[in-house]
């Protein structure tokens, strides 16, 4: 029996247990062993994470696909798991140690600290997984993986060793994003560009061989910089090759102020003649663009900062080389001074010598670490790299050939732009938590890469015996006695970038590199659902690794969803205070309401503007379904054994079967095409408008009337249509549908494993002709009816039934619309005249007279050859229906009211258009504010159009 009130929390708790106990989501179930597999790997959330709105959207869409395919009979594997999240996790544990006033990481040592991290993971690492379960994610939780699991770690080590063997992993000295607080390289994804109000310093660099004078422009070149402290590492000045001002200076030198180093003037397209002086300082060791300029011209790379962001000058051979006498004194004075303190002091020193031409206020973007919030330094250091350019070629080809496709397709352009300009991938991190790099160093720094330390020792001993560094006898002794080789080789302390292990996720989670049957069955996966922000960092790298090691693409389709923003379109952020917590929404409205909201708003390529009111609205939608199901139960509606909708005799029942078939097709095709919003919209309209508002209302006289064959058939059809709704709605709202499936009838199994409704076949030409004849003529000027005739047919489709019920609905809908437009009070009944009605209308109208009168608030329905004077005329499926309003409303007063409302709409339109015509407003206002004005204008235009239509109708009645 269905409870009186819909209580989402109780249902969600109960259904979660039912699904778990029944192993409903287990891949490879005995009843699916021969089924076609369908695989999705979850984008593994950070083990430190908590469910945010992006997770909620991403996992709702994945779950819709998985539940849909499971109901279609597929053997579904939705592979769950979490990412070890190197920096984030290490920071969480370090912060915890600090808060508890316990020894820090350095004091504990690596081994003890890692034990503590694993302890934290055991205690707190399931938070995000439990939250995903609350959302209703139908993953195979028995297969949950963690990127630091033993099996996945084995895959990581094997991939590193093989790529190194093939020359695709190597060590190099290049610039990285360096976090001076965390003391590690970080990825581009972990860098946030923050707008900062700073300064632009214009500096005078004296030309070699000329006597410098601030009053003599021919004695110096002016360069501009936002980071004066890095000038100590300048090794060049770049000018554009076509800039006539500097033609004679190319190849000559300037003398670096304060330092005295000779710096070459080079010609390079990087310099923009239109910006500033047209000359730029080149600091290859402290700027990514300068690094490339330096490579093109063979300029020295002089790093002048240490890992903590302090000047590093005194023991810096690169810096001190070829400097004039007296430079050491400057180095001693500024050595180990913090970069920002040094900036101020260097500028003061430059000003004292006349080397500063001017200083301008300058607002610019400065990179910050997303976790430490410290200013990121481009830092020259030895790191491990992947030859991404080589690995990218097959990944580019796979998308170009269509082997893997993006949805929406426009994301392919983004993918190609990045992949075709890909840079070496820095994969080493100066952390303790993560996959330690499988590389060992011999006494002379020689690198030995191996899967195990024993293997590395073997390689090292063989090498040093061959090089005659040790004797063969020493080699044998060291091989046999661990004590004798203690400390002979030392392991690289760095760990791998988190994205390295994540790149293997589609196959490492299945058991690779072991010959696991799951690899054969579930790889490649079918689809990947993810956000656009990790196309480069994760999607592209999975493509590269999958093709290299599995020789197949990891997924055939990549669906890229948009962002979830606040209701005004602003990006959610803690600083703005506009973050919406999905768990709060689940507590308040239920997981089903949140899921349906996100799906209904997930239009391809369009960000979601999430308002709490929308979630509340879809909770009301769930309540309406609940109440409709209770109504069916109270009226003893049930599907008898052997019931066939195709054999229904009542027109109303054949109509709902037709609409159900049409909706099945709409929902099925929309999900197949990743048009989640269209699928949600179709099922919403069917439940709320077709089933609840029309079918149940039209069926009430039969259900509440005396027993009859028609009543028995209607009871069966009400229950059958409800069951079809539960099936179609289940991927979107799994909890309420599973609950109603269980309590409305005795079932053989779970709704989660029930068969998806069949999609109807295309109509035959004969059926099309029959439908056209039944529908009658149409007028393109009339607004579309609530129920649009669709040429979709299953065995039970009846175009004649659709034409008849569609006529009733169109008629009632248009009458209600006119009553609302004309401000006719609900208690006031009006007459209806069917003018010049066809024989078919004269035949069908009496069957529905009582229903139409009740639903349209009519006093009488009559027939006439023409519409009476003073009546508003409606065109319903090509025929005239007239509402005589003489004496019903005060026409003059209503016209005055409408004119006033039109004036208000005009004022709103003018106000919005004035703002939108203001170029300064459009250029400077926040994007969401501009969009809000556009929406106001469109709403006012639509309101005015309806008011004008009402005014036109009023003229008919006067």
UniProtKB/Swiss-Prot annotation:
Motif 'HIGH' region in this chain: where? 45-55
Pfam families recorded:
Anticodon_1, tRNA-synt_1, Val_tRNA-synt_C
Localization, UniProt: Cytoplasm
UniProt key word Metal-binding: no
- What's one GO MF term for it? aminoacyl-tRNA deacylase activity
Q: Where is the signal peptide?
A: none
What catalytic reaction does the record list? tRNA(Val) + L-valine + ATP = L-valyl-tRNA(Val) + AMP + diphosphate
Per the UniProt entry, the Enzyme Commission number(s) are 6.1.1.9
- The UniProt annotation puts motif 'KMSKS' region at 571-575
- This protein's GO CC annotations: cytosol
Its Gene Ontology biological processes? valyl-tRNA aminoacylation
Superkingdom of this protein's organism: Bacteria
The UniProt record gives the binding positions of ATP as 574
Which keywords annotate this record? Aminoacyl-tRNA synthetase, ATP-binding, Coiled coil, Cytoplasm, Ligase, Nucleotide-binding, Protein biosynthesis
What start-end ranges are recorded for coiled-coil regions in this protein? Answer: 892-958
Query: What InterPro entries does the database record attribute to this sequence?
Result: aa-tRNA-synth_I_CS (IPR001412), aa-tRNA-synth_Ia (IPR002300), Anticodon_Ia_Val (IPR033705), M/V/L/I-tRNA-synth_anticd-bd (IPR013155), Rossmann-like_a/b/a_fold (IPR014729), tRNA-bd_arm (IPR010978), tRNAsynth_Ia_anticodon-bd (IPR009080), Val-tRNA_synth_C_sf (IPR037118)
**What enzyme category does the UniProt record give?**
ligase
Q: What is known of its domains?
A: ValRS has two distinct active sites: one for aminoacylation and one for editing. The misactivated threonine is translocated from the active site to the editing site.
Assembly information from the UniProt record: Monomer.
Q: What does this protein do?
A: Catalyzes the attachment of valine to tRNA(Val). As ValRS can inadvertently accommodate and process structurally similar amino acids such as threonine, to avoid such errors, it has a 'posttransfer' editing activity that hydrolyzes mischarged Thr-tRNA(Val) in a tRNA-dependent manner.
The record's family statement is:
Belongs to the class-I aminoacyl-tRNA synthetase family. ValS type 1 subfamily.
Q: What is this protein called?
A: Valine--tRNA ligase
**What organism, scientifically named, is this protein from?**
Bradyrhizobium diazoefficiens (strain JCM 10833 / BCRC 13528 / IAM 13628 / NBRC 14792 / USDA 110)
Which gene name does the record give?
valS
């Amino acid at each position: 029996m269905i409870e009186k009130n819909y209580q989402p929390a109780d249902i969600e708790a109960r259904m979660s247990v039912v699904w778990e106990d029944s192993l409903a989501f287990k891949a490879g179930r005995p009843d699916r062993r021969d089924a076609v597999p369908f695989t999705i790997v979850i984008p593994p959330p950070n083990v430190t994470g908590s469910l945010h709105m992006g997770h909620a959207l991403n996992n709702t869409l994945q779950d819709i696909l998985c539940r849909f395919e499971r109901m279609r009979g597929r053997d579904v594997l939705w592979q769950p798991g979490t990412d070890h999240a190197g920096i984030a996790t290490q920071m969480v544990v370090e912060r915890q140690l600090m808060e508890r006033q316990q020894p820090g990481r350095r004091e504990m040592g690596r081994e003890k600290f890692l034990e503590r991290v694993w302890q934290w993971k055991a205690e707190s690492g399931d938070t995000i997984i439990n939250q995903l379960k609350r959302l209703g994610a139908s993953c195979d939780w028995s297969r949950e993986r963690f990127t630091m699991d033993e099996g996945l770690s084995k895959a990581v080590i094997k991939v590193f060793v093989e790529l190194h063997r093939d020359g695709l992993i190597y060590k190099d000295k290049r610039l990285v994003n360096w976090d001076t607080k965390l003391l590690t390289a970080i990825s581009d994804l972990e860098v946030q560009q923050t707008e900062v109000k700073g300064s632009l310093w214009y500096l005078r660099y004296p030309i070699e061989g000329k006597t410098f004078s601030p009053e003599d422009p021919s004695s110096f070149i002016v360069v501009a910089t936002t980071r004066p402290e890095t000038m100590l590492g300048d090794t060049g000045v770049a000018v554009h090759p076509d800039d006539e001002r500097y033609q004679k200076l190319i190849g000559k030198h300037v003398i670096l102020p304060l330092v005295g180093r000779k710096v070459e003037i080079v010609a390079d397209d990087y310099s923009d003649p239109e910006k500033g002086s047209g000359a730029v300082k080149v600091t290859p060791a402290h700027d990514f663009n300068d690094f490339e300029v330096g490579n093109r011209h063979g300029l020295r790379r002089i790093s002048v900062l240490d890992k903590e962001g302090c000047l590093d000058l005194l023991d810096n051979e690169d810096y001190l080389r070829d400097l004039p006498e007296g430079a050491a004194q400057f180095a001693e004075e500024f050595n180990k001074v913090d970069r920002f303190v040094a900036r101020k002091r260097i500028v003061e020193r430059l000003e004292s010598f006349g080397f500063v031409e001017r200083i301008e206020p300058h607002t610019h973007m400065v990179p910050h670490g997303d976790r430490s919030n410290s200013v990121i330094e481009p830092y020259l250091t030895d790191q491990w790299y992947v030859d991404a350019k080589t690995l990218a070629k097959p990944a580019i080809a796979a998308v170009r050939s269509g082997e893997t496709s993006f949805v929406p397709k426009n994301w392919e352009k983004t993918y190609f732009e990045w992949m075709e300009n890909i840079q070496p991938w820095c994969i080493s991190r100066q952390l303790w938590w993560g996959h330690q790099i499988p590389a060992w160093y011999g006494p002379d720094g020689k690198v030995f890469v191996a899967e195990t330390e024993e293997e590395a020792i073997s390689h090292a001993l063989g090498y040093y015996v061959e090089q005659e560094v040790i004797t063969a006898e020493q080699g044998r002794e060291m091989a046999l006695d661990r004590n004798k080789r203690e400390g002979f080789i030392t392991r690289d302390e760095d760990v791998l970038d988190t994205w390295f292990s994540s790149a293997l996720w589609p196959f490492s989670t299945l058991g690779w590199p072991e010959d696991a049957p799951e690899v054969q069955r579930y790889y490649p996966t079918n689809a990947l659902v993810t956000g656009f922000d990790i196309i480069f960092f994760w999607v592209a790298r999975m493509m590269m690794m999958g093709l290299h090691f599995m020789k197949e693409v990891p997924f055939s389709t990549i669906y890229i969803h948009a962002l979830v923003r606040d209701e005004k379109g602003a990006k959610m952020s803690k600083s703005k205070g506009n973050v919406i917590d999905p768990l709060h929404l689940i507590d308040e409205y239920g997981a089903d309401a949140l899921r349906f909201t996100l799906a209904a708003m997930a239009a391809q390529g369009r960000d979601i503007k999430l308002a709490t009111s929308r979630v509340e609205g879809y909770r009301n939608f769930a309540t309406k379904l609940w109440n409709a199901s209770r109504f069916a139960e109270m009226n003893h509606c049930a599907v008898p054994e052997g019931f066939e909708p195709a054999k229904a005799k009542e027109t109303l029942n054949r109509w709902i079967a037709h609409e159900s078939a049409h909706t099945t097709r709409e929902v099925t095709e929309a999900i197949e095409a990743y048009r989640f919003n269209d699928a949600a919209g179709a099922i919403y309209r069917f439940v709320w408008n077709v089933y609840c508002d029309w079918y149940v209302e039209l069926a009430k006289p039969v259900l509440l009337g005396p027993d009859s064959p028609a009543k028995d058939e209607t009871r069966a059809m009400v229950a059958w249509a409800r069951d079809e709704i539960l099936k179609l709605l289940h991927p979107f709202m799994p909890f309420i549908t599973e609950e109603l499936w269980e309590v409305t009838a005795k079932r053989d199994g779970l709704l989660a494993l029930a068969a998806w409704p069949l999609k109807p076949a295309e109509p035959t030409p004969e059926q099309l002709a029959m439908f056209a004849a039944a529908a009658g003529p149409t007028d393109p000027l009339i607004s579309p009816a609530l129920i649009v005739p669709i040429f979709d047919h299953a065995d039970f489709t009846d175009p004649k039934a659709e034409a008849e019920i569609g006529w009733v609905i169109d008629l009632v809908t248009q009458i209600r619309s006119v009553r609302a437009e004309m401000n006719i009070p609900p208690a006031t009944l009006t007459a209806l005249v069917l003018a010049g009605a066809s024989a078919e209308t004269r035949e069908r109208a009496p069957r529905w007279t009582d229903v139409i009168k009740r639903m349209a608030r009519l006093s009488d329905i009559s027939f006439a050859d023409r519409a009476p004077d003073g009546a508003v005329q409606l065109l319903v499926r090509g025929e005239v229906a007239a509402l005589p309003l003489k004496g019903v409303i005060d026409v003059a007063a209503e016209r005055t009211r409408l004119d006033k409302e039109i004036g208000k709409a005009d004022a709103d339109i003018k106000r919005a258009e004035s703002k939108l015509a203001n170029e300064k407003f459009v250029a400077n206002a926040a994007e969401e504010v501009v969009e809000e004005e556009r929406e106001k204008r469109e709403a006012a235009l639509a309101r005015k159009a309806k008011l004008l239509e009402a005014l036109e109708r009023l003229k008919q009645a006067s």
